[in-house]
Amino acid sequence: MEEPSEPEGLIDWKERCVALEAQLMKFRVQASKIRELLADKMQQLERQVIDAERQAEKAFQEVQVMEEKLKAANIQTSESETRLYKKCQDLESVMQEKDDIIQNLALRLEEQKQVRIQEAKIIEEKAAKIKEWVTVKLNELEVENQNLRFINQTQTEEIRAIQSKLQELQEKKISCVSSPKTSEGQRNLTFGCFLSRAKSPPCVVRCEEVSKMASNEPEITEGRCVEEMEIAEKPADNQVQENSRSQRKLHETSCSSEQNQKTRASFAMDGGTSQNSGVPVSDWSSDEDDGSKGRSKSRCTSTLSSHTSEEGGQCGRLGSEAYLTASDDSSSIFEEETFDGNRPEQKKLCSWQQKAPWKAQGNLAKGRSQSGVKEQDSSSDELNKKFHSQRLDYTSSSSEANTPSPILTPALTPRYPNSLPGKGGAPLVPPPFQPPPKLRVPNVFSISVALTKRHLSQPQLCSDRMFGTNRNAISMIRPLRPQETDLDVVDGDGAEAVNRMDTGCDDGLFSYDSQDPPPCADDQENSEAPKKAPCNKPPTPPLHRFPSWESRIYAVAKSGIRVSEAFNMEHANKNSADILSYSAASLYTSLIYKNMTTPVYTTLKGKATQISSSPFLDDSSGSDEEDSSRSSSRLSESDARSRSGPSSPRAMKRGVSDSSAASESDYAIPPDAYPIDAECSQPEQKLLKTCLASCDNGKNEPLEKSGYLLKMSVRVKTWKRRWFVLKGGELLYYKSPSDVIRKPQGHIELSASCSILRGDNKQTVQLATEKHTYYLTADSPNILEEWIKVLQSVLRVQAANPLCLQPEGKPAVKGLLTKVKHGYSKRVWCMLVGKVLYYFRNQEDKFPLGQLKLWEAKVEEVDRSCDSDEDYETRGCYLLSTHYTIIVHPKDQGPTYLLIGSKHEKEAWLYHLTVAAGSNNINVGSEFEQLVCKLLNIEGEPSSQIWRHPMLCHSKEGILSPLTTLPSEALQTEAIKLFKTCQLFINAAVDSPAIDYHISLAQSALQVCLTHPELQNEICCQLIKQTRRRQLQNQPGPLQGWQLLALCVGLFLPHHPFLWLLQLHLQRNADSRTEFGKYAIYCQRCVERTQQNGDREARPSRMEILSTLLRNPYHHSRPFSIPVHFMNGLYQVVGFDASTTVEEFLNTLNQDTGMRKPAQSGFALFTDDPSGRDLEHCLQGNIKICDIISKWEQASKEQQPGKCEGSRTVRLTYKNRLYFSVQARGETDREKTLLLYQTNDQIINGLFPLNKDLALEMAALLAQVDIGDFERPFSTPAGPVTNQCKANQTLKQVIERFYPKRYREGCSEEQLRQLYQRLSTKWMALRGHSAADCIRIYLTVARKWPFFGAKLFFAKPIAPSSLGNNCVWLAVHENGLSILEYTSMRLVTSYMYKGLMTFGGYQEDFMVVVSTQSKDRPTEKLLFAMAKHKILEITLLIASYINSFHQQKTTFHHLSAPALLSPRTQAPQARVMGSQPPLSNSRPTKGPTLL
């Protein structure tokens, strides 16, 4: 036990004590330090307490000050709270009242809806009742018609029996028959006038019937018998005349017996006809010509036309134009029908009308000698009274229906009645025997059952002679023109004619007075006729008289619309030479019109279709056909059209459409000559397939086909109908199917280099070979699709969708790849759009060879280290041995291999194909793309750590590799440079004097992205990265990054998933309280607008960048603005954004200025030329305003490299381009004013014919509008000389602005002084007159020129030409193309638009191919030397006119069906050119549309 205790005894306690004392000292030192620190801390806290107490004291003092202020203002907290509480209660009570009002209004709205529903049901019931009543009434009339025919037949038998008895009593004729003969003869004469059923005027009597009326009774009864037998044999569709026979008698016997006696007297004296004409004056003369005579005639005649008599034959179209009809075919609305003097029917009518007076005189003289003079009998009065009462009973129930609607009354007349050809080149000159028709009241009881059962908007099937002349009534109705003065009546007979107003549209529109009844059949009235007229006729309205000053202007204008012969012709010839040699720079034109030089258009289906964007060359459509014989003569129009009817057994046998069965002559009838009505053409399922090879359920594609196509010839650009046969890899064509055993007229070799391009029209295709380009047109889109499919099969194309156009949308990636499938390889151009991979033959091809749907497909890279290169070798193509392979394996399909030549391209394709397939694979693409894919998988969770990754945040250093996958190393290098450019833009401070630095940086960066679309994703990702870190307000970097991002998204948008990332980024940063957030909101608006209107084409302009950087664009919905100039010198500032199109821009402009839409007003937006020349360019509606401004700036800098004018920008002008006379009624005051100044611009530049006197009158009118009253210089003591100088200066300005240049050039000082004096006299005569009156008179005078509103182009015909070698004006107007003399501006010839076959560029000239009426030369090609920019302008202008009328016709056609409600006879269906044939019984009909 001692051993363990020994160590305890060995402890050195002293040392341990020393150690413990040392530790104690350390503790003491530490304690002292702690005390010191604690003391310091306490002192610091004490100081803080003192400061806090001082601040609290100060705050307490401030509180006291504030309380004192509040007390001083008598504002206490309790009172303010009470007041706020009361205000809150008041607001709540008001809100409750508003809610109650809203609920009451909602209840009332529901009640109104229920009331409207009930009213609609009532109206439908009434409509059904009316429909039933009309059906019953028609049935009754039909039964009555049958009864009348039976009665007529019975009376005919009785008449024959009486005739036999009369022959037996021939010897006792004088003693037994003389007394009743007078009464019976008078009775027959009373009704005999109405037996004629000629389509000539109803008052013209057949010579045979006149002789029968004046002869004995057997002859009369025999004539009636024969006529009734002829009527009984007419088809059912013409029974309306039989039905209205008795009613016509009832209606027309309203004339008194005095008028009947007077009729006989007039027949005895004048032969029943008007002087010097076979047509009566009363029915066919205008109100102006008749004067008081036309208004004094009774209401006897209300029918519009009647059947043609046997002697008259089928007369010309002499029916009324009150209710014009239009077919549903594709003839345009502007195709006005005119007389054709070569028609035998019209010659027959003319000769018959010339012979009628002499026959009538002879027969009447003979009848008068036999029947005697005393023919007044009491039975005549009784019959007249009886039938008059019956007529009133019949017509009382349909008085409203008999009243024509003023909306339906205007007649359709050509704007240029004496100039436009009917079928091409022949002038529109009506025959001398044609009288002007008058509007007449239709007869409601003349509607036949067949006409009512048929839908009124359907076109009728026509006979061979009158094919295509049917018209739909409402679709051809034009609104009335505004009331203007007719200057043609100034020199009329009598004092009253001087001041008469013309209420029609123009000189060709027949006036109609709703108070004037149609003239009676008794057309030969003398001066005593008004005394014997019916008393119920209203008095003649008073004639309008003009003031003396207005009459003086109209008198000058009557003969003033012509060019004075005294002006300098040498100057005009010099200007013409300058115009021909004047050409604009093509840079800006190509930018505006998308590289369109001088396009070529053709007219198909009434619509102008572009078939080429470049001018035709000599070999543009060459063939061996041009050298073949042209001995085949062209069939006549009637023969050609007769084959197209459905009754043709040949057409039915072949099973082709109407147009396919048309003429097989050398020159085909244009496709717009055939109807497009669905019931006229045959159904598609009945069409006989012309393919010779069976499709075998789609497995074996056909390689042979035959059928009719239209081919454009080479020398004369017109369409020729040929029979094409595709066989053995060649396309042969013949004149007809019967010529296939002969040598073909030409052949087209189909090889691998051939390409098939579809034109703008659905029926036109362009077949381009190595040598020539062929333009082919099929009869229908379905037939064309069959041809394209077979042609592509022949070209060894495996088309998954051969007729699919190039897909819309921006491709994510595109390039030339090798596609391998099923062991076959092919070099194709691939394009990834959305989730579909399209592949084409080449980059320019518009038709994809096939497509590959990638959604849920398996996309991966293939390791081909074990494969041999021979497996992937392609025919004719050399591939590197180091190419890469991507396999695309869609669901339920075999795999497709894509061979790619470079690694960068492979990575780009692999990433985009993987994204398109919707794969969740995040191992493809760059690091940035993988992070975006991860964010997409978690739907952008805000709390995710991925957002904090450095790759997604702002960085001050540059990047070493692109953020996105790019297909080439050069693009990767460019992406790194692009990031540096963005850094320079963001980091450099914006300084207004040095703003051009930022402008150049932004334009260069965005221009690179527009040039290389692959970089668009890259720059968007870079800007998202650089704007993700929010900085303090005094650091401008990120703010300028937002500005650059705003410029970027206004131009283009990235693809998915970067677009999703951009939208999420903008959404997270949108905040209206900060400037960054405001720019984020502005970027959101830009993204929406870009998605709506598509990407831009040009980089941002200087104005756009300045507005974005300096003018806070987030404060405005339209951050940019530009002035639009008008022809009167004023301008309107219009706002727009980065994606605003011209169409949207014009809608805003029209809304601000109070003008109509461009489709109605014809106004368009023009820009000046950046070269500074006096040229203008019309802007199309789909171009963006910012692109126009940018392209204009680029062109200006390139054309004027030495000048750098930052303030010079594009000048926009808004003026009239298309003038429609039918739209003049709705012109606003602003439009009239602008038309006034635009007409003045034509006048001062010599594009409007008027002599010096009229030019001075017009200048005075315009001075009154522009300046106001002329201030006469008074001699005052202050300064008489000063006033005189001021007046002379004003007159000088007026002469320079409003007087033609050619009349004032070369004038001496004395002549100018006299001109100033004459102008001042005329100007002072207008003192006190308003601007509206002066504008009205100015436009009234200007519209008297037939080519008002037309655009004139200087041209020189190229020899050989039928127009000679002199310079001419080409006037493009609403009805066609007219050629005017250069000096006098007189009309040379005109061509309607339906006669224009082809027009556009031909080498360096302007070409027009027109159809003529010559059999030897059915078409004519006219060439004109013009400036290049003028060729483009006139081509686009003609196409715009044609397409505008086509669109109007389509609109009117759709609106026509419900509007055809007014009852009519068959007579309104007859037009001026000829009567329509009866409705075919085989035509399918619909139920009547009565309401």
From Swiss-Prot:
Q: Report keywords, A-Z.
A: Cell membrane, Cell projection, Coiled coil, Cytoplasm, Cytoskeleton, Membrane, Repeat
**Some GO term, biological process aspect, for this entry: which one?**
negative regulation of actin filament depolymerization
**Localization in the cell:** Cytoplasm; Cytoplasm, Cytoskeleton; Cell membrane; Cell projection, Lamellipodium
Q: Does the keyword Membrane apply?
A: yes
Q: Segment Disordered: which positions?
A: 232-435, 506-546, 612-668, 1466-1491
Q: Which residues form a coiled coil?
A: 19-177
The protein depicted here goes by the name Pleckstrin homology domain-containing family H member 2
* Recorded superkingdom: Eukaryota
Any one GO molecular-function label of the UniProt entry: actin binding
Keyword Lipid metabolism among record annotations: no
Source species: Mus musculus
